[in-house]
């Protein structure tokens, strides 16, 4: 059975875990219909359009 040759220091362990649990930023684009910020490949929540197609009606 494999056994580590030396103890892994706590700072090395924390450094490794920091990369695993790193928060990533969400990509944001503008809606071509209304110009509102939205996530790519998602329906715009302000106008209800996905590209040039209306997916749902937005209550005003």
Swiss-Prot record:
InterPro entries: Ribosomal_bL32, Ribosomal_bL32_bact, Ribosomal_zn-bd. The keyword Ribosomal protein applies. Keywords: Ribonucleoprotein, Ribosomal protein. GO terms for molecular function: structural constituent of ribosome. One of its GO terms (biological process) is translation. GO terms for cellular component: large ribosomal subunit. Signal peptide: none annotated. The keyword Ribosomal protein applies. It holds the Pfam family Ribosomal_L32p. Belongs to the bacterial ribosomal protein bL32 family. PANTHER family: 50S RIBOSOMAL PROTEIN L32, LARGE RIBOSOMAL SUBUNIT PROTEIN BL32. This is Large ribosomal subunit protein bL32. It comes from Fervidobacterium nodosum (strain ATCC 35602 / DSM 5306 / Rt17-B1). The lineage of its organism: Bacteria, Thermotogati, Thermotogota, Thermotogae, Thermotogales.
């Amino acid at each position: 059975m494999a056994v580590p040759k030396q103890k892994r220091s706590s700072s090395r362990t924390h450094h490794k875990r920091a990369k695993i649990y790193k928060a990533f930023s969400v990509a944001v684009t503008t809606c071509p219909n209304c110009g509102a910020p939205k996530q790519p490949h998602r329906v715009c929540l302000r106008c209800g359009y996905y590209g040039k197609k209306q997916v749902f009606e937005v209550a005003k």
